[in-house]
């Protein structure tokens, strides 16, 4: 069963570019080489003075998620330096089983 992993974080507007760059240079390389990684997307929106980012990744199965995230697969994986670009972030992710895709 394919797993969808959802995480959210928020930055000040002036740090939005740095937040995206942090994802592209720090987290994306780790995820993209992890066994069982299928793909990911990052999106953003303005939410009243902050920019919210949502990262959605897809994984082959729960074993792949655990290999990436460790023994607590619902715990967020936040590379060093994340605290420098985000105002706040979710410490936990939401995990879903993908039932169908187009």
Give residue ranges: language-model regions.
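Residue-level signal for secondary-structure boundary sites
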Residues: 15-17, 63-65, 101
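Short amphipathic alpha-helical leader/targeting segments
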Residues: 21, 54, 69-71, 79, ...
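Short, well-ordered beta-strand segments in beta-rich or mixed alpha/beta enzyme
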Residues: 2-9, 39-71
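Alpha-helix boundary recognition
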Residues: 32, 66-69, 87
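Glycine-rich beta-strand-turn "strand-cap" elements at beta-sheet edges
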Residues: 41-51, 77-102
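Short amphipathic alpha-helical segments
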Residues: 15-39, 73-81
């Amino acid at each position: 069963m394919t797993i969808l992993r959802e995480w959210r974080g928020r930055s000040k507007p002036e740090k939005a570019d740095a937040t995206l760059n942090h994802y592209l240079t720090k987290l994306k390389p780790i995820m993209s080489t992890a066994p069982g990684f299928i793909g990911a997307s990052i999106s953003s929106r303005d939410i009243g003075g902050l920019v919210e980012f949502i990262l959605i990744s897809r994984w082959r199965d729960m074993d792949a998620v655990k290999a990436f995230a460790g023994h607590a697969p619902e715990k967020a994986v936040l590379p060093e330096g994340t605290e420098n670009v985000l105002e706040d972030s979710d410490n936990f992710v939401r995990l879903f089983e993908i039932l169908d895709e187009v």
